[in-house]
Amino acid sequence: MVGEQPNIGDLVSQEEPSVLDLNCYEDIPAEEEESEYPYAIVLPCGLCDQLLRLTCVSDLSTLTRLEELLLGSLRIVCPLCAIRHQRH
């Protein structure tokens, strides 16, 4: 821009836009895709609400399924409630 006021020539570029390929062509080795992660879980007991701490090690897809189960109807109970409510 030359001067205090911009003119249309300053704002419009005379160059043609170029097309950029934004696809990622990186190859990820299979061992990285299926690597296992330690995952800490803190949740209340399904019967007495005492906090439980679990650690799982699995691949990401299995951990995602576990999360869906825990957010659904699956309830984990503490050892004391497991003994108290054990069916004989």
Curated annotation (Swiss-Prot):
Highly phosphorylated. GO terms for cellular component: host cell cytoplasm; host cell nucleus. Keywords: Activator, DNA-binding, Early protein, G1/S host cell cycle checkpoint dysregulation by virus, Host cytoplasm, Host nucleus, Host-virus interaction, Inhibition of host innate immune response by virus, Inhibition of host interferon signaling pathway by virus, Interferon antiviral system evasion, Metal-binding, Modulation of host cell cycle by virus, Oncogene, Transcription, Transcription regulation, Viral immunoevasion, Zinc, Zinc-finger. A motif (Nuclear export signal) lies at residues 63-71. A zinc finger (unnamed) spans 45-81. Residues 1-37 are annotated as: E7 terminal domain. InterPro entries: Papilloma_E7. It is found in: Host cytoplasm; Host nucleus. One of its GO terms (molecular function) is DNA binding. Belongs to the papillomaviridae E7 protein family. The E7 terminal domain is an intrinsically disordered domain, whose flexibility and conformational transitions confer target adaptability to the oncoprotein. It allows adaptation to a variety of protein targets and exposes the PEST degradation sequence that regulates its turnover in the cell. Plays a role in viral genome replication by driving entry of quiescent cells into the cell cycle. Stimulation of progression from G1 to S phase allows the virus to efficiently use the cellular DNA replicating machinery to achieve viral genome replication. E7 protein has both transforming and trans-activating activities. Induces the disassembly of the E2F1 transcription factor from RB1, with subsequent transcriptional activation of E2F1-regulated S-phase genes. Interferes with host histone deacetylation mediated by HDAC1 and HDAC2, leading to transcription activation. This is Protein E7. The gene is E7.
